[in-house]
Amino acid sequence: MRDFMAIGRSVAVAERGMAATSHPQATLAAVEMLKAGGNAVDAAVAAVAVQGVVEPQMTGIGGDCFALYSPKAGAPIALNGSGRTPAGTDAGKYSGSGARDIPPTAPEAVTVPGAIDAWCRLVADRSEERRVGK
């Protein structure tokens, strides 16, 4: 039996897929996605969506997403799902003001979260690779 007071992790062995997160429910979501025929991206998105519920202080739909994915064929893919400036922002207001930085507590420092768009792009772009677990 595992001693949860001891430092370290349990040994994990798998033949067809593996998932690890900071929360058991998120890991279970990833494993279930793989069992259902999803690929690594599907599993990662399922896990992070669950983490937004079970660990909202750590991750969620209001944040960003950065991914480096290496498909079986082709070059690795990098995705920058960082927040964007709102569409109605006037860039000239900032460049002509002489300000060097936007104060972090100013309303202008807020970005539109990029996580959900990044998750959707990752899943859509990898849809042809849904063969893991079958």
Identify what each model region corresponds to.
Residues 1-28, 32, 40-134:
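Noncatalytic scaffold domains of N-terminal-nucleophile
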